[in-house]
Amino acid sequence: MNNPNKPLMLVLSSPSGAGKTTLSKKIQQSDNSFEISVSHTTRKPRANEVDGLDYHFVSKEKFKTLLKENAFYEHAEIFGNYYGTSKSSINKITKNNHNVLFDIDWQGSEQLSRFKELNLVKVFILPPSKEELEKRLIARNQDDKEAIKRRMLAYSKDIVHQKDYDYVLVNDNVENCFNNIKGIILKHLKRI
């Protein structure tokens, strides 16, 4: 259960392309008490991504070393790349009494849930439909046809995990979905 005396840890998860990263950025821009957890990854940076801001881009060898050192709260292999949230980055955020915003998949959320000391509120974001998700993936122009096909195959496996979340929202309109998330934040922070 949520503890209003500890920093809130808001988890946003969704199938790839449903809008969790866009929503995460909107939350951070609208509420400076939130800091986005910057994950480590072994994938190559996309255009306009900045190391240390969007992700900590590391080699597979470095990632495996961090795993052996038990440096992560959560980690997963997704589409052949590793992702993980380091304990040190979360501790740095909460030390400043800021709330933490996680932009992670269901596997990461499941692993975070094992740490009872974390003040988690979990929100699963759905696209309006599978067809709309495919349109979004094509429109964002970040993946080739094969990658989009893999993401669409993963969609059905991803959405079964929505039952493990505190809230499930449909992102049919970014502003409406964002306002719903703000309502959830207000409820759990008891801010007006």
Model-inferred region functions:
Residues 2-4, 135, 139-143, 157-192:
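NTP-dependent small-molecule kinase module
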Residues 5-10:
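Pre-Walker A (Motif I) flank of P-loop NTPase domains
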Residues 13-15:
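P-loop (Walker A) phosphate-binding loop of NTP-binding proteins
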Residues 18:
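ATP-binding Walker
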Residues 21:
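Walker A/P-loop
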Residues 29-37:
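Post-Walker A helix-loop "phosphate-sensing" segment adjacent to the P-loop in P-loop NTPases
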Residues 41-100, 106-110:
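ATP-dependent small-molecule kinase phosphotransfer cores
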Residues 43-48, 71, 94-99, 104-106, ...:
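A glycine- and Lys/Arg-enriched "phosphate-lid" helix/loop adjacent to the NTP-binding pocket
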